[in-house]
Regions:
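Conserved beta-strand segments of the P-loop GTPase G domain that flank and frequently precede/overlap
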Residues: 95-97, 174-175, 208-210, 232-235, ...
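Hydrophobic positions on the alpha1 helix immediately C-terminal to the Walker A/P-loop
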Residues: 108
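Pre-Walker A (Motif I) flank of P-loop NTPase domains
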Residues: 90-94
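Active-site signature of alpha/beta-hydrolase-fold catalytic machinery across serine-
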Residues: 111, 115, 138-139
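Conserved Switch II/interswitch segment of TRAFAC-class P-loop GTPases
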Residues: 213-216, 227-244
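Conserved lysine of the Walker
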Residues: 105
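C-terminal lobe/tail of nucleotide-utilizing enzymes
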Residues: 2-75, 185, 242-285
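P-loop/Walker-type NTP enzyme "switch/lid" segment
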Residues: 50-76, 80, 87, 99-102, ...
Length: 285
């Protein structure tokens, strides 16, 4: 059984005292050296084992994931196209990325993770691979002191790094502190082996990977090749058409399982959704 499998088993069997959002926020500000991070693993594991609630979530995330929210209905539609594709095999490992910074890919990834975990047959695991500018831990009110960087760089066991988010069936492995060599870690054999194990075990688990934007990090292209599919976030008024086209051409259209149009004016979005019903791609806030 691989390390990822053991980590999931330990995470599922764990129980403990919930960590408050205030203490989590403080721990995220403290920083600290790499060695200090590893020495406090027992404290981090206690945070991960807790049955925390969504009280520590970013307010925008709490509002957008409200089951009665009109925004969340959009993510239900995207969830449906992922779980029940019309003409291609179901993608179980998915990269969420954008072509440029500031397009909202981290926020989209968090919302999609929440939507996927509400399906009765699936669990969702999120990995924050944007080592330069991580966002997922902050959105969920979770410490980012340790994470995937420690697994790749210091051989820390995944069971210490997997965090509960406060929503059943939704877990997160944060990025950890920004490393000096993000590209080398992403492209390492250890990362490739992790993705292989993610793909081969636990068929009820869907994996979402938040990656650096395409125009910022060249390793995003390589990262995409390890995963089943890609969701590309395109922000209204920000994304450049030529960059989007180039990225899609590099990956191949079959690799794209969804396009998320973020930041559309409400009236424009409504008109677009009406026109695109039944089409293979998805369009959201």
């Amino acid at each position: 059984m691989g390390k990822f499998s053991k980590a999931l088993d330990k995470s599922s069997a764990s129980s403990g005292k919930a960590a408050g959002s205030e203490s989590l926020a403080e721990s995220d500000k403290t920083g600290g050296s790499r060695s200090a991070s590893v020495k406090t693993m027992d404290q981090e594991a206690a945070i991960g084992a807790g049955s925390s609630t969504s009280a520590g979530w970013d307010l925008r995330l709490r509002l957008s994931t409200d089951p009665n929210s009109r925004y969340f209905e959009n993510f239900r539609r995207l969830r449906g196209s992922i779980l029940y594709p019309s003409s291609t095999p179901k993608s179980r490992t998915i990269l969420v990325t954008s072509v440029a910074p500031g397009e909202g890919k981290g926020f989209i990834c968090a919302n999609l993770g929440a939507a996927l975990s509400q399906d009765v047959e699936h669990h969702a695991l999120m990995l924050d691979c944007d080592f330069r500018h991580p966002t997922l831990a902050r959105l969920f009110g979770i410490s980012n002191e340790t994470g995937l960087v420690d697994y790749l760089q210091d051989d820390v066991d995944l069971s210490y790094l997997m965090r509960k988010t406060g929503q059943p069936k939704l877990s997160l492995i944060p990025s950890g502190q920004p490393p000096e060599n993000p590209s080398e870690l992403i492209l390492s054999n250890r990362m490739a082996a992790l993705f292989k194990e993610l793909a081969e075990r636990y068929p009820d688990r869907l994996v979402l990977v938040d990656s650096p934007p395409y125009t910022v990090a060249s390793e995003t292209n390589i990262l995409a090749k390890h995963l089943d599919g890609v969701i590309l976030v395109i922000r209204h008024g920000v994304s450049k058409k030529e960059h989007v086209k180039k990225f899609v051409d590099i990956l191949g259209r079959d690799k794209i399982v969804g396009l998320v149009y973020n930041g559309f004016p409400p009236n424009s979005l409504g008109e677009l959704l009406d026109k695109q019903k039944g089409y293979g791609y998805n369009y959201y806030y």
